[in-house]
Design a protein with these regions (language model features):
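Switch I (effector-binding) loop of TRAFAC-class P-loop GTPase G-domains
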Residues: 2-29
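Flexible beta-alpha connector loops of hexameric P-loop NTPases
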Residues: 6-8, 37-47
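Helical mechanochemical/support elements of P-loop NTPase systems and associated helical scaffolds
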Residues: 11, 15, 19, 45, ...
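Conserved C-terminal guanine-recognition region of P-loop GTPase G domains, centered on the G4
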Residues: 21-29, 34, 48-124, 181-197, ...
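G-domain G4 guanine-recognition motif of GTPases
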Residues: 36, 66-72, 94-111, 125-133, ...
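Canonical P-loop GTPase G-domain recognition
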Residues: 91-97, 102-158, 165-167, 196-198, ...
Length: 377
């Protein structure tokens, strides 16, 4: 970025929590750079800082590992932790870029570079703060490391094409942020415009009026999951129906797994325990979908004795074995890599998982009637 974003010093423990910096990196597009705490931190809080680093690793789509060239000794020994992390990322199918820093302080840095390349079977790129000429090669290598399918999945999949008429039903109630639209709505509108679709956006109370104003029925209606029932009852028969949350189930997660998870709702009881996981951090308001609406729908069916826990942000239990079902939000605030890491944890512990929109579609009896699209999951 060319900016002083993090405090940098030779003192261990300078970086405590991961530092996030968003920027535009051409030709990739918008990226977030995460500067983590050192994994060699042996201070009293070191283990907790390393846990934060591991959490950041779950979100990482490309890992950059720094090796200090002025370290003395056999690379296999002095870089043991760095090599462990490189192996960890490879196991997670995450590309790794190795940088050898402080080359101006080590006369034998070329030998070190060759040895690390032998150990990792990866190219190592030398960098030096006093000579930024090597950064161009690093940027080129970074771009080459980006997965070929990065950014290729689209939100609406194969549901629309050039010239299609699409209606978006977006309640602007007490939960809607002041003066702006929520991220899934913004991203969906932008994608539809890029795909040359004709887009009409309405609030729930103007849904029927909006249909009347159209010269033809929309090919696709995308609604907020909370008003699935109302929109289904009033939509034209020929119009496909889905929701932002269902689309994001495929865009950010594993839609087939979510659908199978939703079917396990029918096997819950009043003694079941459910985890509702919200990615964004906000103060819950009246009729919050995760805190009130979905719990109310579940307890209406199975009784008030059902135990429902909530987590938000990056809080997500390592041990999920005590839950009968996990209900994840759409995941718009996190990247797909991180949502899939949550899904992988649930799968490994044999805990069913679904998301908000798929849950509501199942509970309202229209899960087998809505449109999903293909090509994302």
């Amino acid at each position: 970025t060319g900016q002083e974003v993090s405090i940098v010093a030779d003192v261990a423990g300078t970086t405590t929590d991961p530092v996030y910096k968003a920027m535009e990196l051409h030709p990739i597009g918008p990226v977030t750079i995460i500067d983590t705490a050192g994994f060699d931190d042996e201070s009293e809080l070191g283990s907790r800082r390393v846990q934060k680093t591991k959490l950041a690793a779950e979100k990482t789509e490309l890992a950059v590992i720094l090796l200090a060239a002025d370290e003395k000794g056999e690379p296999a020994d002095i870089y043991a932790q760095e090599l462990e992390w490189a192996a960890y990322f490879k196991k997670k199918h995450t590309p790794v870029l190795l940088l050898l820093s402080k080359t101006d302080l080590a006369a034998d840095w070329k030998q070190t570079k060759e040895r690390v390349e032998q150990l990792t079977k990866e190219s190592v790129y030398p960098i030096c703060s006093s000579d930024p000429s090597g950064l161009a090669a690093v940027k080129e290598a970074l771009i080459r490391k980006v997965p070929e399918n990065f950014g290729s999945p689209c939100i609406t999949g194969d549901l629309v094409e050039d010239g299609d008429l699409v209606m978006l039903v977006m309640p602007q109630d007490i939960q809607a942020p002041k003066g702006r639209l929520i991220l899934p709505q913004v991203q969906t509108i932008r994608e539809l415009l890029d795909r040359k679709c004709l887009v009409m956006s309405v609030t729930t109370d103007k849904f029927v009026n909006g249909l009347s104003a159209m010269s033809r029925a929309p090919k696709l209606i995308i609604t907020d999951s909370q008003v699935f029932g109302h929109v289904w009852d009033h939509k034209p028969k020929e119009s496909m129906l889905t929701s932002f949350s269902v689309l994001f189930a495929a865009y950010k997660g594993d839609l087939p797994y979510y659908i199978e998870g939703a079917k396990t709702i029918d096997r819950l009881t009043g003694d079941s325990r459910v985890l509702i996981a919200e990615c964004c951090t906000h103060a819950p308001l009246k009729e919050d979908i995760g805190r009130e609406k979905i719990p109310r729908m579940l307890r209406k069916r199975y009784g008030e004795t059902m135990k429902i826990d909530h987590v938000s942000g990056t809080d997500y239990p390592q041990d999920l074995s005590g839950y009968d079902l996990i209900i994840q939000c759409g995941g718009c605030m996190f990247n797909r890599k991180y949502i899939l890491s949550r899904i992988d944890r649930a799968k490994a512990q044999h805990v069913p998982m679904t998301n908000y929109g798929v849950t509501i579609a199942h509970l309202t009896g229209i899960l087998d009637k809505i449109a999903y699209g293909s090509g994302n999951s």
